[in-house]
């Protein structure tokens, strides 16, 4: 827990001076004030995150945390548990959606085994396995508290290693059959939200399957009685190893003043967990998209984040972050490369036109 405490103590507020300077700079560029909307807000936010008036977000790295879930035995997913391991092979060989989308958006991808139910020895795979999958949370705690903390610390270590290797932006990705169930349970427990309001169809459940998923989550919460005031207790009782690891990435990135691009529902719950551990983390988050999962709408609202796009995604893997990365990059390039009115020899606005006297 010492490493987690160190991160909490290292996370600061945004640099308001850098934000003000960025806003002033944007207001001198050859465009009407505020006319680039969310792009300008992004540039100002990233200036505040990094503390630089000319921030950089490249190289960008997508970190995909992978783990299995014991609750999958309850039949809460449309796919069998072995798909988790099979997808790791797909990630490593470059055939998954996140690989393709990251190539398009010029981001590197790291795959981390933090809790796969098996032993994988694959070139390029980062082996940080805390335990071989969680227990079935419908019957008892997903893991021990110490294991949840260990998984958070793995995330911190992975984030710091990526940053030390040059990453200027970290994007969150995940894979784990059953992890929408764990994420829904965590959100319901952390925020006292009715389970029915946040559970979606996951990877393609039927209406009957969705009802079963709701019942399993309710049973898990009843059996484990997670403490809403203690996010690590919630993680340990109804969470997942990859969710804990992703929360650690957020903590590590925030401590190093690095922006975090959040993907879909699972990564958003991980980010919410990090914010419940260290509230200042919220300033370092950028929501890449709004997925079709109803719980994702809820989490983005809780975090106060405005998603950059809505493409009806429900994949995970970090896919939304790779799609949104060029938008974030555009915000930075606007600040770096647009000419000012003075540089371009363009006349500014007529001060009194349209204003009440």
Swiss-Prot record:
Substrates-to-products reaction catalysed: 5,6-dimethylbenzimidazole + nicotinate beta-D-ribonucleotide = alpha-ribazole 5'-phosphate + nicotinate + H(+)
Q: What is its EC number?
A: 2.4.2.21
Spell out the catalytic residues. 317 (proton acceptor)
User: What are the record keywords, sorted?
Assistant: Cobalamin biosynthesis, Glycosyltransferase, Transferase
Q: Which InterPro entries match?
A: Nict_dMeBzImd_PRibTrfase (IPR003200), Nict_dMeBzImd_PRibTrfase_bact (IPR017846), Nict_dMeBzImd_PRibTrfase_N (IPR023195), Nict_dMeBzImd_PRibTrfase_sf (IPR036087)
Q: Which Pfam family is one of those matched by this entry?
A: DBI_PRT
Q: What pathway does the UniProt record associate with this protein?
A: Nucleoside biosynthesis; alpha-ribazole biosynthesis; alpha-ribazole from 5,6-dimethylbenzimidazole: step 1/2
Q: Which GO terms describe its biological process?
A: cobalamin biosynthetic process
One MF annotation (Gene Ontology) recorded for this entry: nicotinate-nucleotide-dimethylbenzimidazole phosphoribosyltransferase activity
Q: What does this protein do?
A: Catalyzes the synthesis of alpha-ribazole-5'-phosphate from nicotinate mononucleotide (NAMN) and 5,6-dimethylbenzimidazole (DMB).
Q: Which family does it belong to?
A: Belongs to the CobT family.
What HAMAP family does the entry give?
CobT
Which protein is depicted?
A: Nicotinate-nucleotide--dimethylbenzimidazole phosphoribosyltransferase
Source organism of this protein record? Halalkalibacterium halodurans (strain ATCC BAA-125 / DSM 18197 / FERM 7344 / JCM 9153 / C-125) (Bacillus halodurans)
Q: Which gene encodes it?
A: cobT
